[in-house]
Amino acid sequence: MIDSSRGFTLERLLDATPEQVWAAWTDADEVAEWWHPADATTPRESVSVDARVDGRYAYTMVNQATGEEYPTGGQYLEVVPHDRLVFTWGNPGADPEDTPVATVTIASAGDLTRLTFDLRGVDGMAGDESFYDGWASALDSLVAHLGQTAVHG
């Protein structure tokens, strides 16, 4: 069992609607455009999204410099359209009890939308040292995908 007290939180304030932000997380075509750090790509053919409770998602990030592939996936634990996604995040098919859990919260903030990304259970896993930077970069890719400027929180 992972230590769910270990992790981090990232925020972005986006000039986009909650519906646009939700679609970026739940539409496979959009996911392929941004769900990777700056030094990687996510081929569209590698992406599958079944955004419902107990549904699964999968994608493969490809390092642009080396061609190394990083299959990633998980299971949706909570799905509240335009508001909240909770999912496991790790190797496809990994035991949910031993997999980090991500919570994405989408909330209106006046004319903007606040995105809060929280990842728990990363301490002691291979690659821990790069998870924060990787997710920060991926969220910056999301900002670019939405064609917006974000305020880092």
Descriptions of predicted regions:
Residues 9, 44, 69-73, 97-102:
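Short, surface-exposed coil-to-beta transition loops
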Residues 144-153:
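Short, highly charged C-terminal tails/helix-capping segments
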Residues 86-136, 153:
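Beta-strand/loop substructures that line and gate deep hydrophobic ligand-binding cavities in soluble
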Residues 1-42:
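Hydrophobic ligand-binding cavity/cleft-lining segments
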Residues 21, 31, 57, 76, ...:
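Hydrophobic pocket/interface hotspot
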Residues 43-88:
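Glycine-rich portal/gate segments that line the openings of hydrophobic small-molecule binding cavities
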Residues 18, 51-52, 77-83, 105-114:
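A short, structured loop/turn motif at beta-sheet edges
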